[in-house]
Design a protein with these regions (language model features):
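Glycine-rich, acidic/polar active-site loops that bind/position phosphate-bearing ligands
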Residues: 1-256
Length: 256
């Protein structure tokens, strides 16, 4: 009941679209899947979107594809999968229209992954920086978002005002973007420092990455907040994004 009552207070907007990119590690016997018993495998590089046994092993792809099928059968908008930067690290993407719908689907997708891996004797590590201060990437839940106004009206002035509001609300966002984010958002490994706000076109090292398509379309479309981490609550994340957006005046209404 407590969870349901909290969910009821979350800001929602059916015209707001969210795409969550959930990263995670497969773990076996307390180590990332594919790691040797001691030490580390070859450095990061070939694992990202990798293929072949030496890069992804023999079971991980079977699991992620089975998870995709389970999600689709459950009516979840599972949009894609890929091997991630670190060995044993993967990602799936969930899309939803409305913050509650998107968050509901992400929550269920996480649950299905954990239930699925039980039969393989594999654990899911959701921590955003399970390998600590090493040269291995952490895990995020990059949050792509847009409102009807952003998609249909937008404009450079509105975009710049929106970025100023995101900067002003930096601490409010970090507070709900997942625990231990200071360990992940260090300015290294494709992250921006947790205590500084930045944005840039196609910039993986920015707080908010701006797609080329957004700029080329007259500053209309979606944006990607790269700060939420893999442990973050999708309800709180989406709600805070909508709260910040709601604080920025709009010059005219989007089409009904």
């Amino acid at each position: 009941m407590l969870f349901r009552s909290k969910r009821a207070t979350i800001l929602d907007d059916e015209g707001a679209w969210f795409g969550f990119e959930q990263e995670y590690f497969f773990y076996k016997d307390g180590r990332p899947l594919g790691f040797p018993t001691e030490g580390y495998p070859a450095p990061q590089g070939p694992y990202y979107t990798g293929v072949g046994f030496k890069n992804v092993g023999s079971v991980a792809r079977q699991i992620v594809e089975e998870h995709l099928d389970l999600c689709l059968a459950a009516g979840i908008n599972h949009e894609g999968i890929n091997a991630e930067v670190a060995k044993g690290q993967w990602e799936f993407q969930i899309f939803g229209k409305g913050s509650k719908t998107a968050a509901d689907q992400m929550w269920m997708a996480r649950y299905l992954m954990m239930r699925l891996t039980e039969k393989y004797g594999i654990d899911i590590e959701w921590h955003c920086k399970p390998l600590g201060d090493t040269d291995w990437n952490g895990s995020g839940m990059h949050s792509n978002f847009s409102t009807k106004y952003m998609r249909e009206v937008g404009g450079k002035d509105y975009f710049e005002a929106l970025m100023k509001q995101f900067e002003k609300n930096l601490q409010d966002h970090i507070a709900v973007y997942g625990p231990d984010n200071d360990k992940r958002l260090t300015g290294k490994h494709e992250t921006a420092p947790w205590n500084k706000f930045s944005y840039g076109v196609a910039d993986r090292g920015a707080s908010i990455r701006v797609p080329h398509s957004f700029v080329n379309n007259g500053y209309k479309g979606y944006l990607e907040d790269r700060r939420p981490n893999s442990q973050g609550c999708p309800y709180q994340i989406a709600s805070q994004i909508l709260k910040t957006i709601s604080e920025v005046p709009t010059s005219k209404k989007a089409a009904a």
